[in-house]
Curated annotation (Swiss-Prot):
Segments traversing the membrane: 77-97, 120-140, 154-174, 215-235, 245-265, 426-446, 466-486, 504-524, 531-551, 561-581
Name of the protein this chain belongs to: Sodium/calcium exchanger NCL1
SMART domains cross-referenced by the UniProt entry: EFh
Induction: Induced by cold, drought and salt stresses.
Function in brief: May function as a sodium/calcium exchanger (NCX) and participate in the maintenance of calcium homeostasis. May play a role abiotic stress responses.
Organism: Oryza sativa subsp. japonica (Rice)
Binding of Ca(2+) 1, residues: D318, D320, S322, T324, E329
Chief location category: membrane
Gene that produces this protein: NCL1
GO molecular function terms noted in the UniProt entry: calcium ion binding; calcium:proton antiporter activity
Length: 584
């Protein structure tokens, strides 16, 4: 029988740490006698002990002359302090609670998605729940207190916004490349599960599918609200700043809605893309079949279609020598071609071929129509496959292999169906419970965490932006970061694509939903928009990484160095602009 491990008592430790930052001093009733030790001994009721966190008072100085630093307890009972170590402890404690809140929200969201499947749940609810901890921290950073206090604390919210975006696109992105790297093959694509080249900066890396590039482009579009809000500052004018904030606010939430709707209807988009990929694979199969039958080269040396070979293929398919191709003859052609276990409806394939070739609408394909259609197919193949100038027989083989790869990637996505779960009622209850628990923890401790960061900034004289930029994203994004790293370590194109899509999706929600909450706070409380350096680093990182990831699908190992360097560069840029050039 396993012995139970005794845990260290947590409550005494907390009390000890809190008490270590304080000391006692005598508070008199105002009479001179009460200040002496004799009076204290003779009249113990006339003096009491008060705990204070002020370090400026001394034992010999009168109480009235000692300046007091005060801290305000959150909800009237949570601990507070004005010391550096005390506030550091509170930042770590509240940050850990926000991490647990994010973990509960993530677990509940995944469980709910497993039960109910994609659609409204996966497309609308889950992206919002994933961004909830960050959104709450941004909201409470300027919600309470006077306008001056809110203007001071709202910098914490901007630090979290910038820090989360930069963290995801630099440290997390680079780490996923490192743990997910595979050997890059001769075709420039990472080979699944093959990692024999060590840490070669150019010979290893990761590959993603084209849909991941689309997610990166959406992420790039999500910076538009930042540009709108910053536009008056770019023109060096104070006129229209409030209008710019309102316009950016509207655009932010419009982008959130558009992104969620895109997520909702993505299954239909995937089905449409899958049908198109199957059709392209049929085209490439017919082209390859023509070459395998030794009818000749379909393309001349200069890349133009070889009409003589195309006509030979037509007459070979025309079994009854009627000078036309019927549906039955096209169906026989499809059956005779080995499509390497690609599952599709052959009648549907015949329909699509007929649609491509039968321009006259008489439900048969004449020789001229066949030649014209084959030319279109060959031109499509030439656009899809890069060549070195010479169009050899290998060109058609490469095109067929590429269409097969596109088909397989989309089949993987279309196979993401909802599996039946045991006891769905209990699973739904558990999922809702996790979501409520995570939301409650995030809502309860967001404000104390912001206060602790603000107090730590005052005590340590470190700007609150840098604290929130570095520390808060670790608290709110650690759960997703660990999951992303574990998923990327499976070293497959499929898992890498899903991992980086999630990263880009997280940045998109930061730049839309969380920014929208921040802009609403600025507008409603009539705060000043003065975040030029912060907006600059967000634009810098998003534009560089967005352009970098939008137009390529393979990333060698050296690209992680670029991502890693952007993180300290962002901090240096903010420091120089704010404290050297005085932007803020």
């Amino acid at each position: 029988m396993a012995t139970r491990r005794r845990s260290f008592p947590l409550v005494p430790l907390l009390l000890f740490l809190l008490a270590a930052a304080a000391y006692g001093r005598l508070i008199s009733d105002g009479s001179p006698a009460s200040a002496s030790a004799t009076s204290l001994l003779s009249n113990p009721v006339s003096a009491v002990i008060r705990l204070t966190t002020s370090n400026s008072a001394s034992a010999s100085s009168p109480p009235a002359a000692a300046p007091e630093e005060k801290c305000e307890q959150s909800y009237g009972f949570l601990p507070c302090t004005t010391t550096v170590l005390g506030n550091l402890f509170l930042v770590l404690a509240y940050g850990f609670l926000m991490y647990k809140a994010a973990t509960f929200l993530s677990a509940g969201s995944e469980l709910l998605l497993e039960i109910m499947g994609p659609g409204l749940v996966g497309g609308l609810l889950l992206p919002i729940l994933g961004a909830l901890p960050d959104a709450l921290l941004v909201l409470v950073s300027g919600l309470s207190g006077s306008r001056e206090t809110a203007q001071s604390q709202v910098l914490i919210g901007m630090g979290l916004l910038a820090g989360s975006t930069v963290f995801l696109l630099t440290l997390l992105w680079g780490t996923c490349v490192v743990v997910g790297k595979c050997d890059i093959g001769p075709n420039g694509v990472a080979v699944d599960l093959q990692n024999n080249k060590g840490f070669s900066l150019t010979g290893t890396g990761i590959s993603t599918d084209v849909q991941t590039s689309y997610a990166a482009r959406i992420m790039g579009i999500s910076v538009i609200p930042f540009i709108i809000a910053q536009f008056p500052k770019m023109l060096k004018t104070h006129h229209g700043q409030r209008l710019a904030v309102l316009l950016a606010l509207i655009v932010s939430f419009s982008l959130v809605l558009a992104y969620c709707l895109y997520q909702v209807f993505q299954p239909w988009i995937q089905k449409r893309k899958l049908a198109y990929a199957k059709h392209k694979h049929v085209i490439s199969g017919i082209l390859r079949h023509a070459q395998m039958e030794a009818l000749g080269r379909l393309l001349n040396e200069d890349g133009t279609p070889n009409e003589d070979v195309i006509k030979k293929l037509f007459h070979k398919i025309d079994m009854d020598e009627s000078q036309t191709l019927s549906r039955a003859e096209l169906h026989a052609l499809i059956i005779g071609i080995n499509f390497e276990e690609v599952d599709f409806d052959k009648n549907d394939a015949v329909d699509k071929i007929m649609d491509d070739f039968d321009t006259s609408g008489n439900d048969i394909v004449e020789e001229a129509e066949f030649v014209s259609g084959m030319k279109r197919w060959l031109n499509e193949a030439k656009r899809s496959v890069p060549t070195s100038g010479a169009y050899s027989n290998k060109f058609i083989t490469d095109y067929h292999a590429r269409t097969r790869q596109e088909h397989d990637l989309l089949v993987d996505r279309s196979d993401e169906t909802v599996e039946s779960v045991e006891n769905p009622g209990w699973c739904i209850t558990k999922a809702v419970g996790l979501l409520l628990l995570g939301s409650a923890i995030a809502a309860a401790f967001a404000d104390p965490l912001v206060d602790a960061v603000h107090n730590f900034s005052n005590a340590s004289h470190i700007p609150s932006f840098f604290i929130s930029f570095i520390a808060l994203p670790l608290a709110t994004n650690s759960s997703e970061a660990v999951s992303a790293i574990i998923f990327a370590s499976r070293k497959k194109l499929r898992t890498s694509s899903l991992t980086f899509s999630e990263v880009y999706g997280g940045v998109t929600m930061n730049n839309t939903l969380c920014l929208g909450v921040f802009l609403a706070l600025i507008y409603i409380r009539n705060l000043t928009w003065d975040f030029s350096s912060e907006v600059l680093i967000i634009l810098l990182v998003c534009v560089i990484m967005g352009l970098f990831t939008s137009f390529r699908t393979t990333f060698p190992l050296w690209t992680c160095l670029v991502a890693y360097m952007l993180y300290p560069l962002s901090l240096v840029v903010v420091y120089i602009l704010d404290f050297v050039f005085g932007w803020s």
